Amino acid sequence: MSWQVGTIGNLATLQRGYDLPDSAREPGPFPVVGAAGPNGFHSEARTAGPGVTVGRSGGSIGKVTFVSEDFWPHNTCLFVTDFKGNDPRFVAYLLGTLNLAQLNSGAAQPSLNRNFVYGVRIRSGLY
């Protein structure tokens, strides 16, 4: 394996999570994962596990969570929609080693824009 310089955009594709007000939650087995990690359950999953989320708003901006099962990614996080052939656990580990909070693009409310994340340079044996 040779290590290459690339970007997060080479490693994975991110998408903003889905809205789910507390009033719309229905009891169920699927974790709802937000900026700070799991924050409840719902009757429906929006994406298959394993998955990786990154906190995109508030005090948990940049927090990385690995999710082993199907789940609902909440709108307070970004989630990986395409691992581009890379191992999800390694992607979670690598993202967790980066200081993604430094990419804050918000003013009063911290916010993480996936387009800024894509350009972060990394060195990896993946891609």
Which residues make up each language-model segment?
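A short beta-sheet element
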Residues: 34-96, 100-101, 105-118
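Non-catalytic DNA-recognition/assembly elements of restriction-modification systems
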Residues: 1-34, 123-127
